[in-house]
A protein has these predicted regions:
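Surface loop/turn signatures of beta-propeller and other carbohydrate-active proteins
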Residues: 43-47, 83-102, 131-168, 187-190, ...
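Bacterial N-terminal signal peptides
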Residues: 23-33
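Beta-rich accessory regions
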Residues: 41-81, 104-123, 143, 346-348, ...
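N-terminal secretory signal peptides that target proteins for export/translocation
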Residues: 1-17
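Structural motif
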Residues: 73-74, 125, 190-194, 251-257, ...
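Hydrophobic core segments of beta-strands in well-ordered, beta-rich domains
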Residues: 64, 114-116, 166-186, 208-211, ...
Length: 591
């Protein structure tokens, strides 16, 4: 480092003769070096694809340079002859797309060994010691999370960096909404599943809190849920937060962890796993308190069905029944269930809603959320529809893994989804991060022509985002379109100067709403992205609510009868709106 600094000063003296300028630049370099510098390291190539890297980190984070087109390399972090962390990472061979932080704060100024095994066959033709990764690694005190992505949403939750998919473990406690999520902190594509954690007081503005549940000997951490144990059922403490998740190792088993600090940190239960089975796809436990049964219920995906269990103590579970073999869509894997009791609009009746996420098998390809309505006595769910009836919660291509918050105030059922699709989620044109959650939605039930359907309404917290009324769309806005007087088809077009557009059509006679994103902007990253999606409206639409946010368009019937979520990637934001004659339009800039 001293030689490197000396070379810098020599260059400065040649370029700048003015003493004041020279002094300022020297101070700037000293400040820069205090926060970021290359790491002295020894590279030992054991074979064409196996490297040992010896280093002594001087600051908290080691920046790992990523090249997305490369294959995963297996990396072990070894301190004092013990493996303290294992991960898979696409280390840069030729160039750096972006960097991700490896937190070595516990080992500052201690010898650290990185054991790296590359899996790509091309490694045998190159000298691994010369890879760009070793030259580009930096030790930094703080990781810069400043947004450099033009498609990062303004009012949707996103990870600061890395990959995110399913929302997990969501609960509300003491005025704070807690969102956990499937997270890869070491790259912007799926890998290294960990629970990330964010908190919010308004469901809109989120603070990243870290990764409280990390992989262990049982495997990586797949999806699950969390509950507030108000009566100390589990014996972990009154009001403890108890989390349930799938440990995905050589098999998929269910594990438990508990928190005594409102979900900021977790202790894994010594008796893990708490639930096992021989089914290969055995995952995503959703736990809830059933007041009718005066006990806890757990529902999880088990192959092509949902298994239901009961418990008094959250640790010992009794199998009750299975649902789904003959019901709904089975074109893909069933996963991420939820089960809840909801009032039926306009009646004094309540029914049970079972959410079942499926991939593939969605109505327009890839992943989607189907659901069933019926009765549940704590032991068995009975669907009221015919077995071949399939109902979809959202008729866009980018709404998946929908689950709800536990312990929400006012008996609300607030849902979040992953706003992407497994057909192309790893390829969308962002790098620093990939994926966002949908806007929060309140769920209910309504009846149309003898069938009961789920109602989906944007949560009331979104109203606080409204800023000034504006005359044209912005990159982040809400558009209200009054359709009460529309007897003929209504066409709504969002467009920009690049002739990119999203075309929506309401057909009052057919009771359908469609969205065409085939010319919406960048679409060539996947053959599956161009699409026209169509939804039933269950009667006449009175008002359409459109939420636009950098890379998404979410459309809702104001009364909750229809929802449609689609990603879009315009080269510049849509700034023009055209609507068929007769429809009144109001646009709010969202702040």
């Amino acid at each position: 480092m001293q030689v490197h600094a000396k070379m810098k000063l020599t260059w400065v003296r040649r370029q700048f003769r003015h003493p004041r300028m020279l002094c300022l630049l020297i101070c700037w370099m000293m400040i820069t070096q205090a926060f970021s510098h290359s790491v002295p390291m020894k590279i030992s190539a054991l074979s064409d694809n196996h490297v040992l890297v010896s280093l002594t980190p001087e600051q908290r984070y080691l920046l790992l340079p990523i090249e997305e087109d490369e294959a995963q390399a297996a990396l072990k972090v070894i301190v004092d002859n013990e493996v303290v962390e294992t991960l898979n990472v696409k280390l840069a061979a030729d160039h750096v797309d972006y960097s991700v932080p490896l937190d070595l704060g516990r080992y500052t100024n201690k010898p650290v060994l990185l054991d790296v095994t590359f899996h790509n066959e091309r490694r045998s033709t190159g000298d691994v010691k010369d890879f760009t990764a070793w030259k580009a690694m930096q030790s930094v005190a703080h990781f810069d999370t400043k947004n450099r992505e033009k498609y990062r949403p303004l009012y949707h939750h996103t990870p600061l960096w890395g990959w995110m998919n399913d929302p997990n473990g969501m609960f509300y406690k003491d005025g704070v909404w807690h969102l956990y999520f499937q997270y890869n902190p070491y790259g912007s594509q799926w890998e290294n599943m960990t629970w990330g954690h964010s908190t919010s007081k308004d469901l809109v503005h989120w603070t990243f809190e870290g990764c409280p549940i990390r992989p262990d000997g049982l495997g990586t951490i797949f999806s699950g849920s969390a509950v507030v144990d108000k009566t100390n059922s589990a014996g972990m403490g009154k009001d403890a937060v108890v989390a349930f998740y799938t440990s995905a190792g050589t098999s998929q088993v269910q594990s438990l962890a508990y928190s005594l600090d409102n979900g900021m940190s977790f202790t894994k239960y010594d008796g893990n796993p708490i639930l096992t089975d021989k089914v290969p796809d055995f995952r995503d436990p959703k736990v809830f308190w059933n007041a009718d049964l005066n006990a806890w219920n757990l529902i999880l995906a088990a192959g092509q069905q949902m298994n239901i269990y009961s418990s008094k103590d959250l640790k010992n579970w009794t199998f009750e029944s299975a649902f789904g073999r003959e019901y709904g869509n089975h074109d893909g894997v069933w996963e991420c269930p939820d089960l809840m009791k909801l009032p039926v609009e306009g009646t004094k009746e309540a029914k049970w809603l079972l959410l079942c996420n499926i991939n593939p098998g969605g109505p327009f390809g890839g992943s989607a959320t189907q659901y069933f309505v019926g009765s549940f006595d704590g032991h068995k769910f009975v669907c009221e529809s015919q077995p071949k009836v399939t109902k979809w919660m959202d008729y866009g291509k980018d709404h998946y893994a929908t689950v709800t918050f536990d312990n929400a105030p006012d008996n609300r059922r607030v849902a979040l989804a992953w706003m992407s699709n497994w057909q192309y989620g790893n390829q969308v044109p962002t790098q620093q991060f990939r994926s966002a959650n949908s806007v929060p939605r309140d769920l209910g039930l309504f009846v149309d022509q003898g069938e009961t359907y789920v109602s989906v309404t944007p949560s009331r917290e979104l109203l606080a985002l409204r800023g000034d009324k504006v005359s044209h769309p912005t990159a982040a806005c809400e558009i209200l379109i009054d359709l009460r007087s529309q007897a003929q088809p209504t066409t709504i077009t969002l467009s920009n100067a690049h002739h990119e557009q999203v075309v929506m059509t309401y057909q009052p006679k057919d009771h359908t709403f469609s969205m065409d994103r085939t010319a919406s902007g960048i679409t060539d990253f996947s053959n599956h992205f161009k699409a026209i999606t169509i939804a039933p409206t269950h009667g006449k639409l009175t008002q359409l609510r459109l939420f636009i946010d950098k890379c998404s368009v979410e459309a809702f019937d104001a009364s909750g009868r229809m929802a449609m979520t689609n990603l879009v990637f315009p080269r510049v934001p849509y700034d023009k709106l055209t609507v068929s004659k007769g429809a009144r339009v109001t646009i709010y800039d969202l702040k």
